[in-house]
């Protein structure tokens, strides 16, 4: 990691105005290698190690050409253009312009000193926050992880996970719940699946794809598509349930079981291992997480199957089977949606009404009164102002210690612009996974909500979001945070009907809600796969001790993350978000775009 940022390169357009669609390149004290990985447009004339800029804290800098093509330096003093040939080295000054290829790829060099350097180092700390996101084992179940992105450097994937980090160890039965399933990719990306005796895939694929999967799947795999009683619904939930001899692993995430979702996009994943309940002890008191989980699994109604579990014999795997595990260490709640017309007791079990009900029971710090809300997702339904107010009322629920309601806060929608998609790692192709039509995106009342997908601190500015998150925050502190499969739509969250006595939901969805929760133990870890499955350090308590509650913060929060109550969440986007400028255009996938992307393509292809 760089010790001190002392300069940066500003990307410029051909007219020498700043190119806001590309990130600035920070330069630290000492040598800095710049090459094709720093440029958003593919150009084979650029070498991976094209130039080296050596910068000192005194404000001096030199540039040497390491690639096979010359570089042009345009002096900030007299405007003279000087060609620097391969293997040559020259001095460069503040505000000099650098052309990585003569006439192409313009950058302005800015050298820092004093106060500017201190401010820049703070910005650098923010930019590299993902580098430092290394939560200890005991905090992992209380946070989530981002998925690794192939095109990013190793440091940008710190503490990130891939499918083989999730499906591991001596799994005896697996349930994979998802919308889209590429069976060929899944088997090649995760060879471990071939050795699991019983695998069920709960999916949302259409008839044609379902027939293909049926032909390609291993003989011991079972396919199940849950019933969709209301038109235009989908099975959209993304979860994995792995049964081990020691317990069960529950995983909630945002990626389809396809290559691009696990390799090219910004995605999130939460998981926790839970032990079997001890038959020789009184059963643990039921907890909210267990109720959330069993309620949801009961609705899926998959065909019961049998698995042989070491020491337990043949066991029927159905929804009731999952009551055999001890979920008392869960610090999160599950927010699910299931299709139907929900009334009475069921009105508050699903969708945004479930979220409303849980938040109403929570006590939050006073700083979150009327604090802002974020809606971030990858597909926008056909909305109206009435429903958005209904949804906002649910997300504004909660009280402070003196019973004062948190009250409504300003809401913003984080949504990629056309330029974000064009300059992304996938170019316009990324827009296939942001499938919202013009008629939904360009409703006039939505204009005031739009905010930019800015993700420098997680290095995911060009990894287009398929992650879905909803949160309430104050600066870098978070009241609550939801990682979910739900996009912003009535189909996913439900719409109240019949004078608010009925909630109509079309789709299956699943999310995990992070809340401030009591810190019961320190160093409490259970693992289904580690050689030492359980490590427990009892918390020292005194009679007068006030029960501490966890505090949720972002990766860029500047406090002490080692405090036991601090739970750092890898929120991938900038908070507060930057509202759209007049020039920003929200992405819609059924519009034509003639400006070529980073691969020289237009849209549609």
From Swiss-Prot:
Its main location: nucleus. GO terms for biological process: DNA repair. The keyword Hydrolase applies. Transmembrane segments: none annotated. Its EC number is 3.1.4.-. The keyword DNA damage applies. It is an enzyme of class 3 (hydrolase). Ubiquitous, with a low level in roots. GO terms for molecular function: 3'-tyrosyl-DNA phosphodiesterase activity; exonuclease activity. Substrate binds at residues 238, 468. It is found in: Nucleus. Inhibited by vanadate analogs. Signal peptide: none annotated. The record marks 489 as: Interaction with DNA. It comes from the Eukaryota. Changing residue 468 to A: Reduces activity 100-fold. One of its GO terms (cellular component) is nucleus. Keywords: DNA damage, DNA repair, Exonuclease, Hydrolase, Nuclease, Nucleus. A motif (Nuclear localization signal) lies at residues 81-86. Changing residue 238 to A: Reduces activity 10-fold. Residues 379-382 are annotated as: Interaction with DNA. Belongs to the tyrosyl-DNA phosphodiesterase family. DNA repair enzyme that can remove a variety of covalent adducts from DNA through hydrolysis of a 3'-phosphodiester bond, giving rise to DNA with a free 3' phosphate. Catalyzes the hydrolysis of dead-end complexes between DNA and the topoisomerase I active site tyrosine residue. The TDP domain (123-605) is sufficient to confer the full phosphodiesterase activity. This is Tyrosyl-DNA phosphodiesterase 1. The lineage of its organism: Eukaryota, Viridiplantae, Streptophyta, Embryophyta, Tracheophyta.
């Amino acid at each position: 990691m760089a010790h001190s940022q002392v300069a940066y390169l500003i990307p410029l357009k051909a007219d020498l105005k700043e190119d806001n669609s590309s990130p600035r390149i920070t330069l630290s004290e000492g040598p800095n290698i710049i090459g094709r990985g720093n440029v958003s447009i593919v150009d084979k004339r650029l070498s991976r190690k094209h130039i080296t800029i050596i910068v000192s804290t005194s404000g001096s800098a030199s540039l040497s050409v390491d690639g096979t093509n010359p570089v042009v330096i345009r002096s900030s003093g007299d405007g003279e253009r000087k060609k620097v040939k391969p293997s040559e080295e020259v001095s460069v000054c503040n505000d000099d312009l650098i052309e990585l290829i003569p006439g192409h790829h313009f950058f302005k060099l800015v050298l820092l000193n004093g106060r500017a350097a201190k401010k820049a180092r703070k910005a650098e700390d923010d930019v590299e926050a993902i580098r430092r996101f290394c939560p200890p084992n005991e905090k992992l179940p209380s946070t989530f992880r981002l998925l690794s992105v192939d095109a990013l450097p190793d440091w940008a994937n710190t503490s990130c996970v891939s499918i083989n980090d999730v499906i591991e160890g001596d799994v005896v039965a697996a349930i994979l719940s998802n919308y889209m399933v590429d069976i060929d990719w899944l088997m090649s990306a995760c060879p471990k699946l071939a050795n699991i005796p019983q695998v069920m895939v709960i999916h949302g694929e259409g008839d044609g794809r379902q027939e293909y999967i049926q032909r390609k799947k291993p003989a011991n795999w079972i396919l199940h598509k849950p019933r969709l009683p209301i038109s235009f619904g989908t099975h959209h939930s993304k979860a994995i349930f792995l049964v081990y001899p020691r317990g069960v692993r529950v995983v909630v995430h945002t990626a389809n079981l396809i290559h691009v979702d696990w390799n090219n996009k910004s995605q999130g994943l939460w998981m926790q291992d839970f032990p079997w309940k001890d038959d020789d002890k009184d059963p643990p008191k039921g907890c909210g997480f267990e109720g959330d989980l069993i309620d949801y699994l009961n609705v899926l109604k998959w065909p019961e199957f049998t698995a042989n579990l070491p020491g337990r014999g043949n066991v029927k795997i159905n929804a009731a089977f999952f009551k055999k595990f001890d979920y008392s260490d869960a610090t999160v709640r599950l927010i699910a949606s299931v299709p139907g017309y929900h009334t009475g007791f069921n009105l508050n079990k699903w969708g945004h009404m479930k979220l409303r009900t849980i938040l109403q029971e929570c006590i939050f710090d006073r700083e979150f009164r009327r604090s802002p809300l974020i809606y971030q997702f990858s597909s926008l339904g056909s909305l109206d102002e009435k429903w958005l107010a209904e949804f906002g009322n649910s997300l504004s629920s909660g009280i402070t210690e003196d019973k004062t309601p948190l009250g409504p806060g300003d809401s913003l929608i984080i949504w990629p612009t056309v330029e974000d998609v064009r300059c992304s790692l996938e170019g316009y192709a990324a827009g296939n996974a942001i499938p919202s039509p013009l008629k939904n995106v360009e409703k006039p009342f939505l204009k005031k909500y739009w905010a930019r997908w800015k993700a420098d601190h997680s290095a995911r500015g060009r990894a287009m979001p398929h992650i879905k998150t909803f949160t309430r925050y104050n600066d870098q502190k978070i009241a609550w945070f939801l990682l979910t499969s739900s996009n912003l739509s009535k189909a996913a969250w439900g719409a109240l009907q019949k004078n608010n006595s009925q909630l109509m939901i079309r789709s299956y969805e699943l999310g995990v809600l992070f809340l401030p929760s009591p810190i019961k133990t320190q160093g409490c870890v259970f693992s289904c796969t580690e050689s030492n499955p359980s490590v427990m350090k009892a918390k020292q308590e005194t009679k007068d001790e006030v029960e501490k509650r966890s505090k949720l913060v972002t990766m860029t929060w500047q406090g002490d993350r080692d405090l036991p109550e601090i739970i750092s969440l890898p929120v991938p986007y900038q908070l507060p978000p930057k509202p759209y400028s007049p020039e920003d255009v929200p992405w819609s996938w059924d519009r034509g775009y003639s400006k070529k992307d980073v691969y020289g393509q237009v849209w549609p292809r």
